[in-house]
C-alpha cells in the first residue's frame, strides 16, 4: 500500500463530518467502490456514492458525526464505531453505527459496509 493509504479512513471521516464532498472523494477509489448499507442497499461507483451521501446528509437537519473509535485490523481493513445525530420531525435522534472500510492496493477506500447497532432487551 502506498503512503496515500495512511490516514485515509480518518480523512474520510473528517470530510464526512464537515460535508466536504470534494475532500471525501479524494479518499475513495476511482473504480470499483461498493457501499453496502444497513438495509441491504448497495451503491456502486465513486460518483454515485458521493452523490448519495451529499443528498442524504445535506437533507438531515443538524447532522453531526461523533467518532468513538477507529480500529485498524491491518493496512487494508478498518472498523469505525461512531454515532450520527440529526433531527427528524423536530425530534433529535442518534444512530450508533459500525462501518467496515476496505482499502485497495492504492490505499484508497474500495469497500464500505455500514451496520447499525440495535438496542438490546437488557443485559446479557
Regions found by a protein language model. Name each.
Residues 1-27, 31, 123-124:
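Short, low-complexity N-terminal intrinsically disordered segments enriched in polar/charged residues
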Residues 2, 42, 46:
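Flexible, glycine- and charge-enriched loops at secondary-structure boundaries
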Residues 4, 50-124:
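A beta-strand edge to alpha-helix "cap/lid" segment located at domain peripheries
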Residues 12, 24-25, 32, 45, ...:
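Hydrophobic pocket/interface hotspot
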Residues 33-43:
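A short gly/proline-enriched turn/hairpin at secondary-structure junctions
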